[in-house]
Amino acid sequence: GKGVKVWDKDGNEYIDMFAGIAVNALGHAHPKLVNALQGQVEKLIHVSNIYYNEPAIEYAKKLLPLTEFDRLFYANSGAEANEGAIKLALKYTGKSEIITAKDSFHGRTLLTLAATGHEEYREPYLKNLPQGFIEVPYNDIEAIKEAISDETAAIMLEPIQGEGGVNVPSKKYFDEIAEICAE
């Protein structure tokens, strides 16, 4: 691939509308990304998060001022990031439920499958999935309000559902959810 284009084994050209399921925002083989990756591989390919490394520290210094937070956790996948968020919500609230949306996708690990709103992904593992995920229709504030209980630890939603059919919420959806969470 190059940029937004990819080619199959027969040379047919396609526009990659998936962009690596939204992780290839720069396209394929972007020169700045290729150079940065090559430079990093020449120094250090991977270390556990047990060790500090200069690129991670420099990125955190740039990223954190853009947020209301004073620390971050690097994850290697969406599933790992989502598992971390779920565990933090459960641990620090002491509560047992997380509200999620129908047709959502949060990963393929057991915990993130439990949060995923696609029965076909969960079905083979139903008897082994963790409990506590309350599913509501996407873009439905009233359903979220009705689902909230004394055990609600978090509301876990995608800004735009991909697996659910590229569902874009109303402009006020996340503002209203933020207000609900602040209450």
Model-derived regions: residue spans:
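Active-site and channel-lining beta-strand-loop segments
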Residues: 1-16
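Short acidic, glycine-rich surface-loop motifs adjacent to enzyme active sites
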Residues: 151-166
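PLP-dependent aspartate aminotransferase-fold enzymes
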Residues: 62-154
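Short, small-residue-enriched loops and turns at beta-alpha junctions
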Residues: 23-25, 143, 162-166
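A short acidic, helix-capping loop that chelates divalent metal ions and anchors anionic groups
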Residues: 45, 108-109, 163-165
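Catalytic PLP-binding core of fold-type I/II PLP enzymes
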Residues: 149, 167-183
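Glycine-rich loop-to-alpha-helix module at the N-terminal edge of alpha/beta enzyme cores
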Residues: 13-99
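Beta-strand scaffold of nucleotide-dependent catalytic cores
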Residues: 15-18, 146, 178
